[in-house]
Amino acid sequence: MPTSSRPPRRGAPIPALRFHWLTALYDPLIRTWGAAATMRAAVIDALDLAPGMRLLELGAGSGRLAIELKRQHPDVELCAVDTDHAILQIARRNAARAGVDIAFQHGDMTCPSELGTFDRVYSTMVFHHLQPAAKQQALTTACRALRPGGSFVVADFGRPRGLLQLALFGLIQQPLDGFRNTAPHRDGRFEHAVRSSFGQVRSAAVWKTAAGTLEMFVCKP
């Protein structure tokens, strides 16, 4: 089997579409997902931005959220980090076409390089790709990266709301991203980890989708 066809090694983050060779299809597919635009708008609103703020995105993906954010708030400074070189190449191309200035960096979201320097940290649809221990490490990173008075916004799969959402999550999302990685989202352990990592946490939005229930939290240390 070619190396590019293999699933990621044990303990590594799951790529956007599970296999690295499918990464090129991620951007066209995500544009067809109706919940993506709704989530992007909600996250940007929840960040409550002002000119001059410094932002960190954990898990840049193809850059769609970062690009939309910079279009609406050109006077913020934005650094977007991802572990996947291929998806970062896509993100940089998308940003160049959009004419926005974003610092896309390859890095481990569980190992911060700059502590206490960001006004806002945010992450969308990334944590369900991470192993359970890495989820907690990334939450710690988000908290430690914030300046006093800063906030963290995270949107990802949450506890399924109802039997249909539970079934959809189990049939679609869990096989795609791995049962071990996604189980904490299904059973509430991810929400508990978020609430345990920050002093103030509020659930700001819940969306039911064809792959399961999404939830957005706004957090302060």
Task: Identify what each model region corresponds to.
Residues 10-13, 155-211, 215:
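C-terminal alpha-helical "lid/dimerization" subdomain adjacent to the S-adenosyl-L-methionine
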Residues 62-73:
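Conserved SAM-binding loop of SAM-dependent methyltransferases across substrates and taxa
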Residues 91-92:
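Conserved SAM-binding loop
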Residues 98-110:
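Conserved SAM-binding strand-loop segment of SAM-dependent methyltransferases
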Residues 136-148:
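A short glycine-rich, Lys/Arg-flanked "PGG" loop and its adjoining helix->strand segment in the class I
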